[in-house]
Design a protein with these regions (language model features):
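Short, well-structured N-terminal submotif of metal-dependent ribonuclease cores
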Residues: 1-35, 45-64, 132
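Nucleotide phosphate-binding site architecture
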Residues: 11-12, 22, 41-44, 70, ...
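Generic structural signal for small/hydrophobic residues in well-ordered secondary structure
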Residues: 7-8, 21, 43, 80, ...
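Acidic, PIN/NYN-like endoribonuclease modules and their adjacent C-terminal/linker elements
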Residues: 1-2, 102, 106-132
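Active-site neighborhoods of divalent-metal-dependent phosphate/nucleic-acid chemistry enzymes
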Residues: 67-113
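Alpha-helix capping/helix-boundary segments
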Residues: 10-11, 39, 76, 101, ...
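A secondary-structure boundary/capping signal
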Residues: 7, 36-39, 115, 123
Length: 132
């Protein structure tokens, strides 16, 4: 079965109980869901900005207990350099953290689950939008 890497915006939709996203997550075995260590960092950044949001903290920590957080480094870093250089040559840009997440998904052969169309600029990246 396909591995699905949830982008930060998809995790946010899940935590906010977006019906379509929740349905897809429930229908997908947890072994096939993952997030990037970059998304993990973004989640903790969001929590640091809202230290009093107890329900949010609980929801994020519960998710992190259930989903694989894939480490970022080594071969992924090399792939990032190649992809970024190629995109710059073509005049394509993507937010820095988004490009780190995109190359992570590419490197591990995962479909990136996001509703951010900007990820479509990354050649070869498989995308799905679960907010539909």
């Amino acid at each position: 079965m396909t591995r699905y890497m949830l982008d930060t915006n998809t995790v946010s939709h899940l935590i906010k109980k977006h019906p379509a996203v929740a349905r897809r997550v429930v229908a997908t075995p947890m072994a096939f869901l993952c997030i990037s260590a970059i998304t993990n960092g973004e989640l903790f950044f969001g929590l640091a900005k809202r230290p009093d949001a107890k329900q949010l903290h609980l929801a994020v920590r519960e998710l992190l207990l259930r989903v694989d957080v894939l480490p970022w480094g080594g071969a992924i870093a090399e792939h990032y350099g190649t992809v970024r250089a190629g995109m710059e040559r073509q005049g394509k840009i993507l937010a820095p953290l988004d490009l780190l997440i995109a190359t992570h998904a590419l490197s591990v052969g995962a479909v990136l689950v996001t509703n951010d169309r900007a990820f479509g600029r990354v050649a070869g990246l498989l995308l799905e939008d679960w907010t539909d």
